[in-house]
Amino acid sequence: TVGIYYATTTGKTEDVADRLHNFISSAESPKDVSDVDDLSELEGLDGIICGIPTWNTGADEERSGTAWDSILEDIGELSLSGKKVAIFGLGDSSTYTENYCDAMEELHSYFQKAGADMVGYVDKSSYTFEESKSIIGESFCGLPLDEDSESDLTDSRLETWASQLKGEIPSLG
């Protein structure tokens, strides 16, 4: 079983989570992480897909400005060895071009700390931005999306990423 979790301020991350679910209907319906009473439910999944916006641009920590920020430490203490985890992030590549989707990296690092097998990396070459903490090598540590300046690209990026995830998370296939 694969769960889709998100946190949102304006509703955009929830909307994108729902749109992603249309491409991977074998996953559970998206769930707001603030509605999760016991994070240990994540330990019972084969795969986890997380959606996170970046609101606190330039911050060293708590970059999302959402419910994710208050549970990062708890995520790091979970036992997620062997679990596949993918992250999508929302940001604004033109207004906040020096902090594009920075919150993805923070969530990524805590899931890694919990022993998760991180998947869903996306090559940075098809994106226009100046800097992002979410770059590892030549790739983003997840799928960056820009609903402010590049919303016309979101559905095709989601569809491509969903296909990629079906190859990386066996229980989605």
Each language-model region and where it sits:
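A short beta-strand-loop structural module common to alpha/beta enzyme folds
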Residues: 26-39
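FMN-binding flavodoxin-like domain, especially the glycine-rich phosphate-binding loop
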Residues: 12-15, 23, 27, 44-173
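Short, flexible active-site loop motifs that bind/organize anionic cofactors or intermediates
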Residues: 3, 32, 148
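N-terminal beta1-alpha1 ligand-phosphate binding loop
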Residues: 1-23
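Short acidic/polar alpha-helix capping motifs at helix-coil junctions
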Residues: 2, 36-38, 71-74
